[in-house]
C-alpha cells in the first residue's frame, strides 16, 4: 500500500526491521506454510518507519530519550513515574494524517474482504527487536482483542505505540543491553478467531521443563487465549510425541485436566470489548479440545518448527463456530533451546517430615528458599527484597522488574505456559504456579522452601529446609563397558532423566503409575455400578475428562507407560507389570472390598500369582490393553514386558498363556517377555525358567530378603540386609551364567548396584549385560565402571 502499511501476506522474516518479529513471522507463515496446512488469520501491519515518523511528527524523540537517560530502572517508583509520563505524551499526540488515513483504509479493505460490516480484529504490538532468539520481548507491549470499527482500531494502534514505554519494556531493554532508540514498534491488525466460544492456548515444540526435543507441549482452556498467556487459569495440558505423530499414529503421551475456572469471551456491553466469566461447571470437568485437535495443532507446530529450524513458542486459537484451528503467533523458544546439555544440574531436598503448606505445577527442577513476600498489587512490589519468595495471585509483565529479585515465585493461578512460568525459566528460579490458595495459606514474612525437584508437582514447605545442589559434567563421557540403564518410577521425571546418558530404562514399575496417576482399584472401576456412594464420588472426581471408568484406567496406564517409553526411545524400556501387595491394593480407592487380609503380604498374593487368579483376571486384562495400546497403536515397540514374582515353572507358563490371550504374544512385533529373577527358585531353576521367558532382570531386593530369610521392611533385622552376602552372590552368579549360556538377556534392576558400586563392578566381571540404576547414580557408576574396564 505505502510505507505506513503492509499486508501480512506480503511480509517475510526478512521484513523484521520493518514490522518487528511478530508481524514478520505471521507473514512468513502465511506466505510459506499455508500450503502445508498451517492456518494463520490475515491482516495488516503498521511499519516501524510509520512509528518513527509518528515520534518525529510530534517532536517526542528528545523528550523521551532525555527522560530515560538518567532513569534508574531498579528504583520501581521512579520507573513507574517515568513510564506513565512518557505513555501520556504518546497517547496525547495525534497520529500523522497519512498514517491515520492508511490504517482506516486498510481496515475498510479487510472488512470488505471478510463479509462486510465492522469485523473484529486483534491489535498487537510487534517490536523491531522482538522475538529474536536472544530476546524474549513477548507480552511486554499491549494486545487488544475484539476491536471493532475504524475509530477504535486507530485508537488502539496509538495505545500499542505507547506500550513501547511500559515499565517492564523499559526495564527489559536496560537489563538486556538494548538501546531505547534502537527499538521501534509495529502494530499488527489481525482478524479475530471466534475462540470466545471455542478454546485457545499456547504450545511449545519441546518440553518446557527438561528441554526434551521429541515432544510438543500443548496448553488449552475455554475462551480467548489471554487467560492462558496471563496465567489467570489453570489450563489443560497435553504432551504429544513427535516421532509417533510423524508416523501418523495416535501420539498423545499424557493429558492433564486443568480447572479452567474462568474464561474470557466477547462482551456485548457497549464500550466493553471482552469480559471474563466463570466457566460453566459442566465444562470444567471436560477437556477443552479433543484429541484430534491436539494432534492437528501438533502437526501444524511441527511444520512451523521445521520451517524455522528451531524450537518454537506458538499461540493458537480454535474458532468455536467453524471448529477450525488457527495459529495466531509463533516465535523462537528462548530458554531451553539455548541451554547446553553438557552439564546437568540436580537439586535434592531433605524434606523428611517437613510440613507442606501448598502445592501446584512445578516450573523447572530447582529449589529456592527465603522469606515469603505476599504481593497483592503493584503497590506492594517495593517490599520484595533480593532473595525473597514472591507470592501472588498471578503475575503480568508489569511485575518483571521485581521478579528478578526473587529466589522463587509462587502463584495461585496459571499453568506452565503462563507469564510467571516463562519469566521464572528465563531467570532460572523455581516457580510453583496454579497453587490455588498460596496467598491465603502463606503468611507475609514466613520462611519457606519452594521445591520443583520432585516431578510435575511443586511443593511449598514450612521453614528453610536443607537441600543439595550438584552439577554433573557430561562432556567427553567414555564408552560404557556394559549397558547402563535407569530405574524410573515417575513418568513426570522421565523427560528430565532421559537427558542423562543411558541405554534405556531397566525398570519401570506399573504399580507406581497406578498409585500416583490412577489411585483406584481396577476392580472398583470394572464394577463401577456396585460401589458405595462415597466411593463413587471419589472415583468420579478422578476420572473427569476420560469418559467411562475402564477407559480412564487403560488410558492413564498407557499415558504413563508411553511417557516412559518415549523418553529414551529407541532404547529399550522394560515395564514391570503391577506388583502391588494385597495391603497396597487395599489402600486404593474402592480396594478394601477386593483384597484379602494377609499376615505377610510381602510373600503373599502378588505378582504372577495375581495374573492367573480368577479374582484378578479382568483387572490384569486392562494392564495388557494399556501395553498393547502403547506398542501397537502408538508404535513404541522398544517396550518390553516383565513379569514379577514368578514362583514356579507352571505359573510362568500360565502367565505366558494369559498374556497371549490378551494380545501380547511373545515374539510378535518384536515383543520380549522377561521375568524378574527375584526368588531363589528362579536362580536355582534358571535354565528351566529361561526356556519360558526371553531373559532375566534380577530383582536383588526380594532375592536378598528371601535368600537370607528376613523382612526388608523390619527395622530389627535391617542391618542383616546386604546384597553382597555370599549366598546372594552365588545365586546372582548362577542366574547370569545360565542366561549367558542360552544367549538370553540378563540385567539387574534392584537397589544393590546403586547403593554399592563394588557390587556393580562384580556384576560386570560376572558378565551381566546391563545394570539399571537410580538416575542420581548413573554418571558416577558409568565413569567408575569405564575406568575399571580401561585398567583391565
Question: What are these regions, as identified by a protein language model?
Answer:
Residues 1-188, 284-292, 297-300, 305, ...:
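N-terminal beta-alpha lobe that positions the nucleotide/phosphoryl donor
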Residues 29-33, 207-210, 405, 421-429, ...:
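Alpha-helix C-terminal capping segments
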Residues 61, 321, 335-337, 342, ...:
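Acidic, glycine-rich flexible loop/linker segments
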Residues 118-122, 127-137, 141-145, 182-186, ...:
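Conserved alpha/beta-domain cores
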Residues 137-171, 197-268, 328-361, 405-412, ...:
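Extended active-site and interfacial segments that coordinate phosphate-rich ligands
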Residues 139, 309-334:
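Conserved metal-phosphate-binding beta-hairpin within the catalytic cores
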Residues 215-313, 318-319, 358-369, 386, ...:
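Conserved catalytic alpha/beta cores of large enzymes that bind or transform nucleotide phosphates
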Amino acid at each position: 500500500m505505502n510505507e505506513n502499511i503492509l499486508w501480512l501476506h506480503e511480509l517475510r522474516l526478512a521484513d523484521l526491521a520493518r514490522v518487528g518479529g511478530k508481524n514478520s513471522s505471521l507473514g512468513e507463515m502465511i506466505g510459506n506454510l499455508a500450503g502445508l496446512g498451517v492456518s494463520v488469520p490475515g491482516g495488516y501491519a503498521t511499519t516501524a518507519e510509520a512509528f518513527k515518523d509518528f515520534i518525529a511528527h510530534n517532536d517526542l524523540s528528545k523528550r523521551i530519550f532525555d527522560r530515560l537517560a538518567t532513569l534508574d530502572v531498579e528504583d520501581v517508583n521512579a520507573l513507574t513515574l517515568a513510564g506513565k509520563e512518557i505513555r501520556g505524551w504518546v497517547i496525547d499526540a495525534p497520529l500523522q494524517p497519512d498514517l491515520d488515513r492508511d490504517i482506516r483504509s486498510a481496515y475498510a479493505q479487510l472488512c470488505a474482504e471478510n463479509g462486510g460490516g465492522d469485523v473484529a480484529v486483534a491489535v498487537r504490538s510487534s517490536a523491531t527487536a522482538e522475538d529474536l532468539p536472544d530476546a524474549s520481548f513477548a507480552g511486554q507491549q499491549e494486545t487488544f482483542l475484539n476491536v471493532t470499527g475504524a475509530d477504535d482500531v486507530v485508537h488502539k494502534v496509538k495505545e500499542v505505540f505507547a506500550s513501547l514505554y511500559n515499565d517492564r519494556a523499559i526495564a527489559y531493554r536496560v537489563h538486556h543491553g538494548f538501546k531505547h532508540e534502537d527499538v521501534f514498534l509495529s502494530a499488527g491488525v489481525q482478524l479475530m478467531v471466534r475462540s470466545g466460544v471455542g478454546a485457545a492456548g499456547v504450545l511449545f515444540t519441546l518440553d518446557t521443563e527438561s528441554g526434551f526435543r521429541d515432544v510438543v507441549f500443548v496448553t488449552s482452556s475455554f475462551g480467548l487465549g489471554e487467560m492462558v498467556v496471563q496465567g489467570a487459569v489453570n489450563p489443560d495440558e497435553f504432551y504429544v510425541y513427535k516421532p509417533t505423530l510423524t508416523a501418523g499414529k495416535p501420539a498423545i503421551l499424557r493429558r492433564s485436566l486443568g480447572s479452567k475456572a474462568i474464561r474470557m469471551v466477547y462482551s456485548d456491553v457497549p464500550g466493553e470489548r471482552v469480559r471474563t466469566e466463570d466457566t460453566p461447571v459442566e465444562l470444567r470437568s471436560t477437556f477443552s479440545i479433543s484429541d484430534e485437535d491436539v494432534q492437528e495443532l501438533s502437526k501444524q507446530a511441527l511444520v512451523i518448527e521445521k520451517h524455522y529450524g528451531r524450537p518454537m513458542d506458538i499461540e493458537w486459537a480454535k474458532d468455536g463456530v467453524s471448529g477450525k484451528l488457527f495459529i495466531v503467533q509463533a516465535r523462537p523458544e528462548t530458554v531451553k533451546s539455548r541451554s547446553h546439555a553438557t552439564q546437568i544440574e540436580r537439586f535434592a531436598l531433605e524434606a523428611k517430615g517437613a510440613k507442606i503448606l501448598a502445592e501446584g505445577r512445578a516450573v523447572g527442577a530447582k529449589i529456592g528458599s527465603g522469606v515469603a513476600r505476599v504481593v497483592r498489587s503493584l503497590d506492594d512490589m517495593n517490599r520484595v527484597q533480593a532473595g525473597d519468595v514472591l507470592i501472588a495471585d498471578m503475575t503480568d509483565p508489569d511485575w518483571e522488574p521485581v521478579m528478578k529479585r526473587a529466589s522463587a515465585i509462587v502463584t495461585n493461578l496459571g499453568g506452565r505456559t503462563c507469564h510467571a512460568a516463562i519469566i521464572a525459566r528465563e531467570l532460572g528460579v523455581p516457580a510453583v504456579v496454579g497453587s490455588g490458595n498460596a496467598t491465603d495459606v502463606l503468611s507475609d514474612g514466613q520462611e519457606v522452601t519452594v521445591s520443583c525437584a520432585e516431578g510435575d508437582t511443586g511443593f511449598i514447605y514450612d521453614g528453610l529446609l536443607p537441600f543439595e545442589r550438584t552439577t554433573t559434567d557430561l562432556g567427553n563421557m567414555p564408552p560404557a563397558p556394559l549397558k547402563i540403564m535407569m530405574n524410573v518410577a515417575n513418568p513426570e521425571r522421565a523427560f528430565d532423566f532421559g537427558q542423562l546418558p543411558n541405554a534405556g530404562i531397566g525398570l519401570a514399575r506399573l504399580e507406581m503409575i497406578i498409585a500416583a496417576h490412577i489411585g483406584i482399584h481396577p476392580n472398583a472401576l470394572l464394577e463401577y455400578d456396585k460401589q458405595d456412594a462415597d466411593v463413587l464420588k471419589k472415583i468420579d472426581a478422578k476420572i473427569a475428562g476420560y469418559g467411562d471408568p475402564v477407559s480412564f484406567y487403560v488410558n492413564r496406564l498407557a499415558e504413563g507407560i508411553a511417557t516412559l517409553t518415549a523418553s529414551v526411545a529407541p532404547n529399550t524400556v522394560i515395564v514391570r507389570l503391577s506388583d502391588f501387595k494385597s495391603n497396597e491394593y487395599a489402600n486404593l480407592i474402592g480396594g478394601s472390598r477386593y483384597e484379602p487380609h494377609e499376615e505377610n503380604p510381602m510373600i503373599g498374593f502378588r505378582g504372577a500369582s495375581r495374573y492367573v487368579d480368577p479374582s484378578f483376571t479382568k483387572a490384569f486384562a486392562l494392564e495388557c490393553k494399556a501395553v498393547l495400546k502403547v506398542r501397537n497403536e502408538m508404535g513404541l515397540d522398544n517396550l518390553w514386558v516383565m513379569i514379577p514374582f514368578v514362583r514356579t515353572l507352571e505359573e510362568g507358563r500360565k502367565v505366558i498363556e494369559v498374556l497371549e490371550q490378551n494380545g501380547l504374544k511373545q515374539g510378535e512385533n518384536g515383543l520380549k517377555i522377561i521375568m524378574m529373577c527375584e526368588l531363589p527358585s528362579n536362580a536355582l531353576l534358571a535354565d528351566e525358567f529361561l526356556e519360558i521367558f526371553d531373559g532375566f532382570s534380577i530383582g536383588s531386593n526380594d532375592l536378598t530378603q528371601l535368600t537370607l530369610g528376613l523382612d526388608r521392611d523390619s527395622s530389627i533385622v535391617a542391618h542383616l540386609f546386604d546384597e553382597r552376602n555370599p549366598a546372594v552372590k552365588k545365586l546372582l552368579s548362577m542366574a547370569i551364567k545360565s542366561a549367558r549360556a542360552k544367549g538370553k538377556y540378563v540385567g539387574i534392576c534392584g537397589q544393590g548396584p546403586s547403593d554399592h558400586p563394588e557390587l556393580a563392578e562384580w556384576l560386570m566381571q560376572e558378565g551381566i549385560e546391563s545394570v539399571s540404576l537410580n538416575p542420581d547414580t548413573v554418571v558416577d557408576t558409568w565413569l567408575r565402571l569405564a575406568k575399571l574396564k580401561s585398567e583391565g
